[in-house]
Amino acid sequence: QAGQTAVITGAASGFGLEFSLQAAQRGLNVVMSDVQADALEAAVQRVRQAGATVLGCHGDIAQSAVVQTLLDRTLEQFGAPHLLFNNAGVAHGGLIWEHTERDWDWVLGVNLRGVAHGVRLFTPHMIKAAQAQPGWQGHIVNTASMAGLVCAPNMGVYNVTKHAVVALTETLQQDLCLVTDQVRASVLCPYFVPTGISHSHRNRPPELRSQGKPTPSQLIAQAMSEKAVSSGKVSASDVAAATFAAIEAQQFYIYSHPNALAPVQTRMEDVLMSRNPSDPFKDRPEIGQRLRAALRGDTPA
């Protein structure tokens, strides 16, 4: 509702920017956080031009102190937010045993700890606001991925973090239901949507950059990710609109491609039937054949 406040991480591009713009269109105050200072400044100006009161907060949400500052500044200017979008994320691929300790630290830091920091720090204030006002409503949206519901090969560390975000958010929803009727959660699981996530290495902190050259599997994963993301037909704006509709409907699982859930069903059937994981390429075997050949050194992917 107009006059309420939304906090959005990863707000300078992709889903985060669209969440910010559509929050502004709804008359909300908008708090925007991003690790890219120049992009954040431009995004803040764009959202401000849409008519919103905007607060920009630069920093890496993998660091708890950054999220604490984000909370403090939000409370100081607007009070407890009604909407929290823990949206910032990065992507990294390759064979799972080839991820370095720095790879794990970087991707876990942003994709999982960043979400955990947001939930840990903001949720108590949202619950407190709900307790003080019977009509107060709050909602937390955590951005996961279809990679949080299935396990595609050559995407190990990314899959791990996104599965963790789904588990975190399911637990958050269950825990909220124990203590309040006024704050709820949703998990966003987008498929391939044109955003900047396939180029997220541009924001990797210097101290967490990999030493040495990328492995062949990592180069293949990067190329496949860029191709898949850029070819997506559903826009970030479409996903943001679906997310706001889901918030209003108190819908927990949010999908960018609701007609592309067959792999999720197959995985659940594998689990229930104690069946070995199904071949993810069974419907497009030529892709699997090319990937196997490339990783075994027979031919390029």
What kind of region is each of these model predictions?
Residues 1-31:
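Canonical Rossmann dinucleotide-binding motif of NAD(H)/NADP(H)-dependent dehydrogenases/reductases
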Residues 26-42:
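Conserved glycine-rich Rossmann-like NAD(P)H-binding loop of the short-chain dehydrogenase/reductase
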Residues 37-38, 58-69, 101:
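The beta1-alpha1 cofactor-binding region of Rossmann-like NAD(H)/NADP(H)-dependent oxidoreductases
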Residues 95-96, 100-108:
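Substrate-binding pocket helix/loop in short-chain dehydrogenase/reductase
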Residues 119, 161:
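Active-site helix of classical SDR
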Residues 145:
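Residue(s) in the substrate-gating loop at a strand-loop-helix junction
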Residues 178-258:
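SDR active-site lid
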